[in-house]
Every structure is written in C-alpha cells, then in structure tokens.
Regions:
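Accessory alpha-helical DNA-binding modules that contact the DNA backbone or grooves
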Residues: 42-43, 54, 58-165, 169, ...
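A glycine-rich phosphate-binding loop feature that marks nucleotide/adenosyl-phosphate handling sites
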Residues: 202-209, 343-347, 399-403, 422-429, ...
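C-terminal accessory/binding modules appended to enzymatic or scaffolding proteins
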Residues: 24-25, 333-335, 495-529, 647-685, ...
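Duplex nucleic acid-engaging cores and interfaces of nucleic-acid transaction enzymes
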Residues: 45, 58-64, 71-342, 346-443, ...
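Long, charge-rich intrinsically disordered scaffolds of nucleic-acid metabolism proteins
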Residues: 108, 112, 420, 426, ...
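Long, charged amphipathic helices and adjacent flexible linkers at domain junctions
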Residues: 305-323, 436, 471-504, 609-657
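Single-stranded RNA-binding regions, centering on S1/OB-family and related RNA-binding modules
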Residues: 561-784
Length: 784
C-alpha cells in the first residue's frame, strides 16, 4: 500500500543542489527532506510533524522532492548502464565520459549514446560493408580539391560480401551507387549527432503540428471520432483531452495521427549549418546527405519523441484532473454516525433496502416494489423507519433513483429525517469485490451494494477507500493514461486525504487503516485482528502490541490515529505522542491537568509559546499543538447539508430551455463540468459557461460534489445531450460552436456520469463547424 514506509537511498549532494534550484527552495530544505525520506519517513508525517526540519514545506513540495529524486535516480541508473556498455565494447573515451556524466536528462543521455547504440542492419551499415566509409569521410571533409565523382570511381568494382545471411559476393557497380552509399553513411552520422537532434527537437517543440485524419473506408465505423476526421492544430497548444482523443482513435484503427513540421524544409535549414561548411562539389554531397538525414531519419525520430512527450504531458494533465476530483469526493461532508435506511433502486428486481446502525453495521435487508406493490412497499418502509429508529434515508442515484426518491418523500417522513440521493458510482464494483465478500460472505451482491450506498452517506472517505479509485468515475481518459503514474497519484491523494482527516483506530476498516502513514495492508490487518481478539484499544501506546508495528511505524502512524475515549485525551487528537511532554509541561506551568488545559480556552491563551521552543521543537509545531488542543481530533471536512433535486424533473423530457435547476457537480474535466440535475444523465457546463468571466481551469470554479444552480441551455433528446450554463444571462438554445461548449450526457443506464470530450477548438485554417455527437467518450471512458 502506498502509505507504508517509503525507503530511499541516501541523498546525492549533486541532486540536492540541482533540486533546490529547480524548486526554488533552500538547499537545507531539500537536503533535510531527502534525508527524512531516506530514513523511511512518509510525506504526510514529514509535512505535519517535521516542519522545523523542512522549513515548513507542505505535502505538495515534499512529494515533489520525493518524485524528482526518484527521477534523478533513474537517470543515474541509465547513466551507469550506458557507461558499462561503452566500457565493455571499448568505446569510452575521456571526452565522451565527461559528456555523459554531465547529462542531466534521459534525452541528453540517449542523444549521446545514439552513435554507439547496437543497431540493426541499416543503409549506412550496408554502405560500410561496401567499403565506402573512407569515401564518406573524404566527402564530409568538404575539401575544395575533392572531386566526388573521381573519388567514387575509385570504389567502383570493389568486391564485398553482404552480411545479409546469403553470403553472395557482390561489387560496387556504379559511381552513383558509391556516392549514394557514402551519403547514407553521412546521413546516419548526422542523425546521431546530439547537436542536430537538439536543434531539430527545439523546432518541433515550438512549431510542430498535431493532425489526424480518418482511415479510408472507416468513415461510418469511426463516426464517434468525426471531429478528428480532418484535424490539425499546434502541438504546443493542443489540450490534453484532444491529444488523448486522437490517440484513442488511432489505437482503435479509426484515425491516423501525425506530428509534423508545418514546413519540412525549415527542419533541414536548422540542421544544415551544423554540417555543410563549403559551397563545392563535396559540400553539395554533404548537403544532400543532411537533407536525407533530416527527412528520413531525424524527423521520424522527432515525431516519435513528440508523440511520447505530448502523451506524457496529456497524461499528467488528465491524472491531475482525476486526482483533484478524487480529493474532493474523499473530502465530501459525512452525515456522521446515524441510523440509515439505504435503498438501491431497481425496477425488475425491486428496490433492495438495508438498515444500518450508527456504526454502519447491517441490521436487516429486504426488497420492496414501489412500482407494482406500492401499498406493501409503503407499509414496509414506514415500519423500518419506526422500528430501526432511522435518522436518514440514502437512495442510489442510478436508474429509478428519482422515482424511488419521490416515493419515499411521499411517505411523509418527519422533516428531521433527510432523504438524500447518493452517487452510487463504483458501488456495483465494490459489491463484487473481495473486500465486500469478506465483509458480507452470506449476502448477495445487491445487499452489499445497498450497504455501500448507505455507508457512503455516513462517511464517504471510509467507504470510498474500499474501491479502486478508477471505478469512481471522476476522471477523463483514465484507461488511456500511464496506469502506474495514475495509481501513484491516486494513492498519494487517498493517503493525503486519509491522514488529513485522521482515523479512529477502534472502528476503522483495515482498508482505511492501510492508508495511514507508516502502515500497510499487513499491519492494518494485524491491528484489526488485535482489536477483535482483545477489544478496543485504550491508548495509542497499545498499538505497539500489534505484530509488525514497530517503533518506526508507530512514529509515522501515531499522530494520525485517534483513540476516542482514551484515558489520555491527547490520544484522540492530532498531537503526536512525542509532543505529549510539551503539553504536560504547559498544563503544569499553569497549575492544570491536561484535560483542564484542553477545556479552558482562557488558560490556553496565556501560554507563551516562545517559552517552550527547543532545538527540536519550534513555533510551527507549538502553534499546531495549541490549535489542536482547542479542537482535539477535529474533522476538517465540511458539515453535512442535505440536497434535493427539483421536484417534477425526473427525466430528460422534463427539461425545458431556460429552466433554472439545482444540481450536483459529478465530474470536472479540462473542458468543463458535468452536472447531475436528477434526470439520469448528466449535462455539460462547458468551460465557457461556468462563469460570466473567463475561466482557464474549470477546477478553479467548481469541484465534484459541489451544489450549483444551472440554467438549461439546450436539450437534444435524439443525441442524448444536455447543455447547461452557470452564467447569469446564458444564451438559450444557441448552437455553441467549437470552443463555446458542447453538451454531453449519459448515453444510457450503463454509461458513466461525466467523462465526455468536446469537439476540438477551431483552427484558423478551418471554417466553423456545427457540433457533432461527442457523447461517445462518456461511454468509452470506462471499460465495458
């Protein structure tokens, strides 16, 4: 699990210096953080309990240092591998070694290694078999006295045996064959030159165009990609979702995607001055070789690089969107410990009903049929509410959710019992998971799913950590991005959120415990086993009795674990056990006990923090301690507020232009936000419709789970599209052109909420086009 101890090698001084410059930090901040990471400290622990050591670095900065150090380590490992390969083949010289040691990126290393990389048989190697390397060297020198034709004539008739496995003797037949072979040797030399590659790379990075076109004969089959049938735009400005959309079309053999220069001759002109040094016959041969090298070897190599580079950038953008959305969902306000009746709506098989106690324990389950056995369903639900003293009702927002909600509201329950629609994304995946089978081995999938819906209302964080984050449905193109990078980012997000909230050690599941700083799946399971065997923990100190939870793990975890009702009230706070003596001294100096100090704000106000500053404990930690004493174990999540959709609006057909409706943001992407207005398919608020002012990043305006008011701009039932706006005066019914906004929605009961892709923005060379069907991405965004 990502939250376990993170061991790194001791920091390299050169890496520390360079990283301090890159991140604009002081050297001691990077060095201290790197040292803590090397000793096994976690990101949450370092940022929360080692502020004096790091100079107040936050989680983002600590994680950046960790990730960059890993990248630098990977570069060093590749450097060592290259040096070993060159030494083994006796190709290493002092100048080359110095250049390799000075290379700071993998790209620079690979450019240096390119001429020496073992390669397959090429046109240049064939020319060398013909004995033409001396001719290539002669031409490359560009001596005015050199006559290329005469020099080539000397090689005509040269006998050689091609290394093609056939071993049939051959000869150089003509002068042109000799010159062509010499140019091939020069061309390969040019293509492997680090300066040539660097120059052309810069040209591609600044001017390259990404384009796509439909494969001939696939026009009908590829209809979902028709926005990209004939598309081009500057690569440097291409948004991540468009890059990923084109790549997906290519992977599905619908599109051809290219990254090219607007003018290939510009690439040749950039490289040519490095090699063409004279205007004479020999120089002309070199010029021809450079042009060939650029078009045949360098440009394809740069295209491959740019494709990978743009994919990496697009992945990073998409992963950030996913992680940001996930954080908001995990931080969603919890209902808290209340008795809940949870309902998983269904028509054919009925609505599965479960009753949960205040700790989320399953007490009872049943099935009701509001659509065809309304009287019986009403009697059952009313009986459940009364018998189990229900304090809230949770209803899944899937098919039949609004109808079920209307039925429950019609029961006339007390106003003190909120009826809440709960996002059920991922509930079905949880119900079939090993975690669910372990929790409820004697119940079927429908019961497990309903329990998950109820618990998600009570404590979203505790329930969502049981799911694979990718199944929650708040990303864009999550199946197209680098899966290891995605997992790392999402794990970091879960770890950050779990530790930011804190975990009650006596009630937390092993899944939740496994994300606590310093713990892992094995230790978490041992904590639960010890809890089941000997009863609730009475203090944090008792955690040391848990198998495999040693002093280091205790140091990293203790501050994030809460023991409610412990003898020492500090055990229920975020004050780390290592700081207990400080609190005890503060209390003693005021003639108080620790509990008295925690209760009496007027006494705490008298504490002079400077008095307690030591070599290891400074004002940042002391300030945190006093703040925690005021609200021990406080939950940083917002207070729960019930939300209701508009009555009478249950399906897309109920929507009318100009309607103003309450909605819940379900997904935020780079191009806008998807909003649930209670009609079983989400509408899109395009980035241009999020506010009256310009919005660059949708995430700066809206977050998943946020309650918003929207205006219905357009409803296209045949195309399953709903366009919404958050502007104060939206233009109703406007056919929003490229970049202005595109409605998107669920394509049916099984389609995920959100995750669509708008058509690309119009490039200057194309006329405006009408919106096309873009809902396909919503369906593609999850595996079928």
């Amino acid at each position: 699990m990502a939250s376990g101890l993170f061991l790194m090698s001791l920091p390299n001084p050169d890496h520390v210096l360079r990283l301090a410059q890159e991140l604009n930090l002081k050297v001691h901040q990077v060095a201290s953080t790197a040292q803590l990471l090397a000793e096994g400290a976690t990101v949450p622990f370092i940022s929360r309990y080692r502020k004096e050591v790091t100079g107040m670095l936050d989680e983002v900065q600590v994680a950046a240092i960790r990730d960059r150090l890993e990248q630098m380590k990977a570069i060093d490992e590749r450097r060592a591998s290259i040096l070993a390969s060159l030494k083994e083949r006796n190709l290493l010289n002092p100048v080359l070694e110095k250049s390799i040691m000075a290379a700071e990126t993998l790209t620079a290393l690979e450019d240096l290694y390119a001429p020496f990389r073992p390669k397959k048989r090429t046109r240049a190697t064939i020319a060398k078999e013909k004995g033409l390397e001396s001719l290539a060297n002669l031409l490359f020198a560009q001596d005015p006295a050199t006559d290329p034709v005469a020099a080539a004539q000397a090689h005509v008739g040269f006998a050689y045996t091609p290394e093609d496995g056939k071993n049939q003797p051959a000869t150089v037949a003509t002068v042109e064959e000799a010159l062509a072979g010499a140019r091939d040797i020069i061309a390969e030399r040019v293509s492997e030159d680090k300066d040539a590659r660097a120059r052309l790379r810069r040209v591609y990075q600044s001017t390259a165009v990404i384009s796509s076109r439909v494969l001939t004969g696939k026009e009908t089959e590829a209809a979902k990609f028709k926005d990209y049938f004939e598309w081009s735009e500057p690569l440097a400005k291409a948004p991540s979702h468009r890059v990923l959309a084109m790549r997906r079309g290519e992977q599905e053999s619908m599109l051809i995607m290219r990254v090219t220069l607007p003018d290939e001759l510009a690439g040749v002109a950039e490289v040519e001055p490095l090699f063409v040094k004279a205007k004479n016959p020999a120089g002309e041969q070199v010029r021809l070789a450079v042009a060939d090298a650029t078009k045949r070897l360098l440009c394809p190599a740069m295209e491959t690089e740019m494709r990978l580079e743009s994919k990496k950038r697009a992945d990073a953008d998409a992963i950030k969107v996913f992680a940001d959305n996930l954080r908001e969902l995990l931080f969603a306000a919890p209902l808290g410990q209340k008795a809940v009746m949870a309902i998983d709506p269904g028509f054919r098989t009925g609505c599965k009903v479960v009753l949960l106690d205040r700790q989320g324990k399953l007490l009872h389950n049943d099935v009701v049929y509001p659509d065809r056995q309304a009287v019986e369903a009403k009697e059952k639900l009313e009986g459940f509410v009364k018998f189990f003293k229900v304090e809230a009702v949770a209803i899944g927002n899937g098919t039949g959710g609004r109808e079920t909600e209307a039925f429950v509201r019609g029961l006339g329950l007390p106003a003190s019992i909120p009826v809440v629609m709960v996002n059920e994304s991922g509930a079905s995946i949880y119900s079939a998971s090993e975690v669910a089978r372990e929790e409820f081995p004697d119940y079927d999938l429908t019961v497990r799913g309903a329990v998950s819906i109820g618990r998600r209302l009570m404590d979203p964080l505790a329930e969502l950590v049981k799911l694979d984050a990718k199944s929650i449905g708040v990303g864009q193109y999550q199946h197209d991005v680098d899966q290891s990078a995605l997992k790392r980012s999402l794990d970091d997000t879960v770890v950050s959120t779990v530790n930011g909230v804190g975990v009650e050690v006596n009630t937390a599941s092993k899944q939740l415990l496994s994300y606590v700083s310093g713990l892992n799946e094995s230790i978490a399971a041992n904590i639960v086993a010890r809890r089941n065997e000997k009863g609730p923990f009475q203090s944090r100190a008792e955690l040391l009795e848990v198998a495999r939870l040693g002093p280091k793990a205790f140091e990293q975890a203790a501050g994030f674990l809460r023991v409610r009702g412990a003898t020492n009230p500090l055990d229920a706070s975020a004050v780390h056990p290592e700081s207990y003596p400080i609190v005890e001294k503060m209390a003693a100096d005021l003639g108080l006990t620790v509990p008295d100090l925690m209760r009496d704000g007027s006494k705490r106000a008298k504490i002079k923090l400077e008095t307690y500053v030591t070599e290891k404990v400074g004002l940042p930690t002391l300030t945190d301690i006093v703040a925690e004493l005021a609200k021990p174990g406080r939950d940083p999540r917002q207070q729960f507020e019930a939300f209701s959709f508009a009555e009478g609006v249950n399906k897309p057909e109920d929507l009318k232009q100009g309607m103003k409706l309450p909605g819940l943001v379900t997904n935020v992407t780079a191009f806008g936000a998807f909003v649930d207005v209670g009609v079983h398919q989400d509408g899109l608020v395009h980035v241009s419709q999020l506010a009256d002012t310009f919005v660059k990043e949708p995430g700066s305006v809206v977050k998943p789970g946020q309650k918003v008011m929207v205006t219905v701009v357009e409803v296209d039932l045949p195309r399953n599209r709903i366009a919404l706006s958050m502007r104060s005066k939206p233009e109703l019914g406007a056919r929003m052109q490229n970049g202005a906004g595109t409605p998107s929605s669920r394509t049916g009961p099984s389609a995920p909420r959100g995750g669509g892709t708008p058509p690309p923005a119009r490039p200057a060379q194309r006329a405006p086009q009408s919106l096309n069907d873009d809902w396909f991405t919503a369906a593609l965004n999850k595996k079928k």
